Amino acid sequence: MSQEILDQVRRRRTFAIISHPDAGKTTLTEKLLLFSGAIQSAGTVKGKKTGKFATSDWMDIEKQRGISVASSVMQFDYKDHTVNLLDTPGHQDFSEDTYRVLTAVDSALMVIDAAKGVEAQTIKLLNVCRLRDTPIVTFMNKYDREVRDSLELLDEVENILQIRCAPVTWPIGMGKNFKGVYHILNDEIYLFEAGGERLPHEFDIIKGIDNPELEQRFPLEIQQLRDEIELVQAASNEFNLDEFLAGELTPVFFGSAINNFGIQEILNSLIDWAPAPKPRDATVRMVEPDEAKFSGFIFKIQANMDPKHRDRIAFLRVCSGKFERGMKMKHLRINREIAASSVVTFMSHDRELVEEAYAGDIIGIPNHGNIQIGDSFSEGEQLAFTGIPFFAPELFRSVRIKNPLKIKQLQKGLQQLGEEGAVQVFKPMSGADLILGAVGVLQFEVVTSRLANEYGVEAVFDSASIWSARWVSCDDKKKLAEFEKANAGNLAIDAGGNLAYLAPNRVNLGLTQERWPDIVFHETREHSVKL
């Protein structure tokens, strides 16, 4: 271990933003970049002419619909730290891609629409974070509007999400009467003014909740605030760093992302409290972030980030050591050495060549089809990082094309989209039609649009009478062959070459499992691990 690597690892913070759709996640992403100095005004990257679309929403379908469909990666410096921010799809139909992104972070920022409280997608995503005890910071957004009672919101988070809340700031009013927040730990009041371009130093601060100036500023509100703070301090949890790092307690902040209010406090908490890169599990051993040798894993593949180049980028989370441009690294699944000369880092779709990267950083490797999600890279050691799952799809469609001459383009397009995780592709063992599996309907719309725009293929999706999929495996090859022969009509091969059972309904799946006790039916499978 070198002191240089240790110092660089300590400076890193890698986190994702998770939320239900429309809670204000993309707005918050923009504002974090604005406050860090990474961009000059929300929606435009510093020095680049990117139009008026959000920095992190770069795919055409995202621009049309105003949702984050793909996960983007943004790196910026703040307070002598390097921050890697992973923006995740907020739309409920994109949970599988979001799950995978959560395997590449060390902490998460949960955004809640304070008018609505805890919503379905938030519950799913927090459950994924809980699998890895990921520390969570919470931001209650939209206090410039009429919202629900703040104590009620804390109770809801604790009861539904089963994580204890420690309010760090507390709101003064809401909607038209929103005056600001009181910072409980700092004993300061930050005064709210509407306006999306206001920067941190432009908000007024009053020191001390007993400051006489507050009677002049808020003659009607100040006594209620003091009473509320007394109640909150008596009834809620104090912030405890160890409990936060264990994923048991979440610090809670209140504000209005669209008005830049409450953003700096969140950034400071992520720098001061969130963990630096942590050790990662691999099949042979635990890999420490400050080891001398480079290693990392692929958690996402994005096709055609640059429409002009029609390329694919594999997103790699660095787990240990130091990456240097031009170094040789081994692609372990196929046992091939590659010279990493054109590796990039991101500000959404704006790319810069990487000279060096450390644990916690996300780098992009140009991919011509050899790299898959879950692949591990090292300087030679046979490491395979674990914990990057595929989830069983919930919706299925058969796919056909209007122009049979374009069958090769269809197959190529679906292969690429399958590899990047936009959709799961199954080739039935009997029958010609390919079957697509997804977590939500919008994924099929995205695939239709991308097949047309990127591959020139007009595809038609028909409903498929499939209830769910299970990957199957068996140690006894003879038994597996018998199972395949008896169930050929329900079996398919996925994009990774794995055998899957496509069940028409719940009863069928249950009966099949009973009839074949030696066959293991898996609801998830590890990426790049052949069952």
Curated annotation (Swiss-Prot):
Keyword Nucleotide-binding on entry: yes
Location, primary (coarse class): cytoplasm
InterPro entries: EF-G-like_DII, EFG_III/V, G_TR_CS, P-loop_NTPase, PrfC, RF3_C, RF3_dom_3_sf, RF3_GTP-bd
Classification via CDD domains: RF3, RF3_II, RF3_III
UniProt superkingdom: Bacteria
Keywords: Cytoplasm, GTP-binding, Nucleotide-binding, Protein biosynthesis
Compartment(s) where it occurs, according to its Swiss-Prot or TrEMBL record: Cytoplasm
GO aspect biological process, one term: regulation of translational termination
Domain tr-type G: residue ranges: 10-278
Keyword Nucleotide-binding set for record: yes
Pfam families given in the database record: EF-G_D2 (PF22042), GTP_EFTU (PF00009), RF3_C (PF16658)
Molecular functions (GO terms): GTP binding; GTPase activity; translation release factor activity, codon nonspecific; translation release factor activity, codon specific
UniProt-annotated binding residues for GTP: 19-26, 87-91, 141-144
A GO cellular component annotation in the UniProt record: cytosol
NCBIfam families associated with the record: prfC, PRK00741.1, small_GTP
Family in the record: Belongs to the TRAFAC class translation factor GTPase superfamily. Classic translation factor GTPase family. PrfC subfamily.
Function: Increases the formation of ribosomal termination complexes and stimulates activities of RF-1 and RF-2. It binds guanine nucleotides and has strong preference for UGA stop codons. It may interact directly with the ribosome. The stimulation of RF-1 and RF-2 is significantly reduced by GTP and GDP, but not by GMP.
Name recorded for this polypeptide: Peptide chain release factor 3
Species this protein is from: Neisseria meningitidis serogroup C / serotype 2a (strain ATCC 700532 / DSM 15464 / FAM18)
